[in-house]
Amino acid sequence: MTVKLKKPKKYAVAKNATLLAAFGLIGSLSLAKANDELIKLEKEPGQWVMQNKNYANTRYSELNQINTKNVSRLRLAWSFSTGALRGHEGGPLVVGTTMYVHSAYPNHVYALDLTQKPYAIKWQYTPVQNSQAVAVACCDVVNRGLAYANGKIFMTTLDGQIIALDANTGKELWKMKHADVTKGETITGAPLVVKDKVLVGVSGGEFGVRGRVGAYDINTGNRVWLAYSQGPDEEVLLDSDFNKEFPQHGGPGDGTKTWPGEQWKLGGGTTWGWYSYDPALDLFYYGTSNPGTWNAEQRKGGDNKWSCTIFARRPDTGKARWAYQMTPWDSWDYDGVNEMILPDLTVKGKKTPCLVHFDRNGFGYVLDRRTGQLIEAQPFVYVNWAKEISKENDRPVEIPEKRTKQGVDTKGICPNSMGGKDQQPAAFSPQTGLFYVPTNNMCMNYEGVEATYTAGAPYVGANVLMYSGHEGKDDYYGAFICYDALKGKRVWEIHEHFPVWSGPVVTAGGLAFYGTMDGWFKAVDIKTGKVLWQQKLGSGIIGNPITFLGPDKKQYVAVYSGVGGWFGIAVAQNLPPDDPYAGLGAVGVAYQAGLPKATTVGGELYVFALE
């Protein structure tokens, strides 16, 4: 079926929308409506209106038609090609009877009418982009998905745009520029709508960019506020009560004084991961990436705040209520951007609003999401760069010989720069009170080298060689684990030959669905870890599965297939094995693990149902 592409408009806001905004009408009319609608829709089991199911990022569905007793009867219902190859991260949305599908670059968007068997394309949209973005994309040309609110679909593009489309027609409503590819800035993360604002981050921590989050009015596209990850307090947007309960976590002025000179201006701290929101507290949460450069000795002189940090901000103003830095003066590229899951857990006999975060540095953190109080922090993978997180000051107790240095090849650091897990989100089941976590099992050698900044050019400053876990002793590179965050213990685990780069969905049917990088889509019993069903797909899976009810009231499970991402870059770009340091170390470890012989590129959506 051929669909005519809609020609994008120039960067502009509709005149009448601007006029309404000038009179203050749009915000007052839509603020409650957009937020109330999403809060209602996220609770409907049959729909999937946010990338991680809900504001709390639990990736838990109450659907149970497909369960441990009948999942063996799961069969392919239909599939859909996205028209793009390379890595397919994130997942589709299902709003009402329409599924919204996205692709890797060039960032196609499709609306599929599910009332037609099996579907009909309602509309298709492909943005006009600056192709220079492909050259400055760090770790594949991925996109982690769309957002929905108030009859609109919000998308980001690799070249730094945030675009609003009419959800029913695909008509472009507005678009704004948020990132500048000439500086090495891109956008790979999914936006999140909170109230009448769409929140957008930025990628490019390997190019000396300065991380930030922006809020844009969902009706006009006008920017409401911009909050930087480091720099002067008025640009980081610290609230008057910032970290008041735990000043040892940092305070005013730290965005500059914990850096040497003006290095903070090239300080990374990008914001390309997942965002969550607590409507009751009116705070949204996200993490920041590694500081720039990877060579820590060029940043010597302090903690480099606020890189590798969890932020809690007020969505109306962007002001930070609290922040907690996980890896001070990062020396290993341990980005802190992974998802913030917001369960209420029983802590010392009391129900507590928590934030649970599985960090690249290998530690799983439990914090009180009201104040940033650290409740627990234990390794969820093998860690040898730090002994523990101190109960005295909430900082890692480092093992000195594992801190990297310029001109020194520090060997056997675990985990590697890809982390105990990367952005692939974990899931939480309220049935079990446990977390289901896709993990990596890899270590590395790391040598800092002096980096010189040129706008738009790589600003890495490290040579990294990666290999399997436990200093190369293991024969597997990943695992899917069930984890008790409060006890800091694994309940069960499934060893996978490749890193698990697919964020699971867990269901009331007692199942967890996830994919592997060699293309196996699996369903496991959440209580035991037993694999109950699996299906080989056309390409490696780095997408996050979803589940929904179709118009026929049947439960479906959907997932993208399309290998890529950081670990899969050798396959996605067809890179030779000659230089094991290429792809920031990914090429060597991918060939060592045998990924290029296990899968090839793709770009397909697969949808399954009971036969």
Curated annotation (Swiss-Prot):
<feature type="binding site">
    <location>
        <position position="360"/>
    </location>
    <ligand>
        <name>pyrroloquinoline quinone</name>
    </ligand>
</feature>
<feature type="binding site">
    <location>
        <position position="333"/>
    </location>
    <ligand>
        <name>Ce(3+)</name>
    </ligand>
</feature>
<keyword id="KW-0732">Signal</keyword>
<comment type="similarity">
    <text>Belongs to the bacterial PQQ dehydrogenase family.</text>
</comment>
<feature type="binding site">
    <location>
        <position position="188"/>
    </location>
    <ligand>
        <name>pyrroloquinoline quinone</name>
    </ligand>
</feature>
<dbReference type="InterPro" id="IPR017512">
    <property type="entry name" value="PQQ_MeOH/EtOH_DH"/>
</dbReference>
<feature type="binding site">
    <location>
        <position position="206"/>
    </location>
    <ligand>
        <name>Eu(3+)</name>
    </ligand>
</feature>
<dbReference type="GO" id="GO:0016020">
    <property type="term" value="C:membrane"/>
</dbReference>
<feature type="binding site">
    <location>
        <position position="333"/>
    </location>
    <ligand>
        <name>Eu(3+)</name>
    </ligand>
</feature>
<dbReference type="GO" id="GO:0052933">
    <property type="term" value="F:alcohol dehydrogenase (cytochrome c(L)) activity"/>
</dbReference>
<feature type="disulfide bond">
    <location>
        <begin position="414"/>
        <end position="443"/>
    </location>
</feature>
<protein>
    <recommendedName>
        <fullName>Lanthanide-dependent methanol dehydrogenase</fullName>
        <ecNumber>1.1.2.10</ecNumber>
    </recommendedName>
</protein>
<feature type="disulfide bond">
    <location>
        <begin position="138"/>
        <end position="139"/>
    </location>
</feature>
<feature type="binding site">
    <location>
        <position position="144"/>
    </location>
    <ligand>
        <name>pyrroloquinoline quinone</name>
    </ligand>
</feature>
<dbReference type="Pfam" id="PF01011">
    <property type="entry name" value="PQQ"/>
</dbReference>
<feature type="binding site">
    <location>
        <position position="203"/>
    </location>
    <ligand>
        <name>pyrroloquinoline quinone</name>
    </ligand>
</feature>
<feature type="binding site">
    <location>
        <position position="270"/>
    </location>
    <ligand>
        <name>pyrroloquinoline quinone</name>
    </ligand>
</feature>
<feature type="binding site">
    <location>
        <position position="290"/>
    </location>
    <ligand>
        <name>Eu(3+)</name>
    </ligand>
</feature>
<dbReference type="GO" id="GO:0005509">
    <property type="term" value="F:calcium ion binding"/>
</dbReference>
<keyword id="KW-1015">Disulfide bond</keyword>
<dbReference type="GO" id="GO:0042597">
    <property type="term" value="C:periplasmic space"/>
</dbReference>
<dbReference type="InterPro" id="IPR018391">
    <property type="entry name" value="PQQ_b-propeller_rpt"/>
</dbReference>
<feature type="binding site">
    <location>
        <position position="566"/>
    </location>
    <ligand>
        <name>pyrroloquinoline quinone</name>
    </ligand>
</feature>
<feature type="binding site">
    <location>
        <position position="205"/>
    </location>
    <ligand>
        <name>pyrroloquinoline quinone</name>
    </ligand>
</feature>
<keyword id="KW-0574">Periplasm</keyword>
<keyword id="KW-0479">Metal-binding</keyword>
<feature type="binding site">
    <location>
        <position position="335"/>
    </location>
    <ligand>
        <name>Ce(3+)</name>
    </ligand>
</feature>
<dbReference type="GO" id="GO:0015945">
    <property type="term" value="P:methanol metabolic process"/>
</dbReference>
<feature type="signal peptide">
    <location>
        <begin position="1"/>
        <end position="34"/>
    </location>
</feature>
<feature type="binding site">
    <location>
        <position position="335"/>
    </location>
    <ligand>
        <name>Eu(3+)</name>
    </ligand>
</feature>
<feature type="binding site">
    <location>
        <position position="272"/>
    </location>
    <ligand>
        <name>pyrroloquinoline quinone</name>
    </ligand>
</feature>
<feature type="binding site">
    <location>
        <position position="290"/>
    </location>
    <ligand>
        <name>Ce(3+)</name>
    </ligand>
</feature>
<feature type="binding site">
    <location>
        <position position="501"/>
    </location>
    <ligand>
        <name>pyrroloquinoline quinone</name>
    </ligand>
</feature>
<dbReference type="InterPro" id="IPR002372">
    <property type="entry name" value="PQQ_rpt_dom"/>
</dbReference>
<keyword id="KW-0485">Methanol utilization</keyword>
<dbReference type="InterPro" id="IPR011047">
    <property type="entry name" value="Quinoprotein_ADH-like_sf"/>
</dbReference>
<comment type="subunit">
    <text>Homodimer.</text>
</comment>
<keyword id="KW-0560">Oxidoreductase</keyword>
<comment type="function">
    <text>Catalyzes the oxidation of methanol to formaldehyde or formate in the presence of lanthanides (Ln). Is a key enzyme in methane/methanol metabolism, allowing M.fumariolicum to grow on methane as the sole carbon and energy source. Can also act on other primary alcohols in vitro, such as ethanol, 1-propanol, 1-butanol, and 1-hexanol, but is not able to oxidize secondary alcohols and acetaldehyde. Uses a specific cytochrome cL, encoded by the adjacent gene in the locus, as electron acceptor.</text>
</comment>
<dbReference type="GO" id="GO:0052934">
    <property type="term" value="F:alcohol dehydrogenase (cytochrome c) activity"/>
</dbReference>
<feature type="binding site">
    <location>
        <position position="204"/>
    </location>
    <ligand>
        <name>pyrroloquinoline quinone</name>
    </ligand>
</feature>
<comment type="pathway">
    <text>One-carbon metabolism; methanol degradation.</text>
</comment>
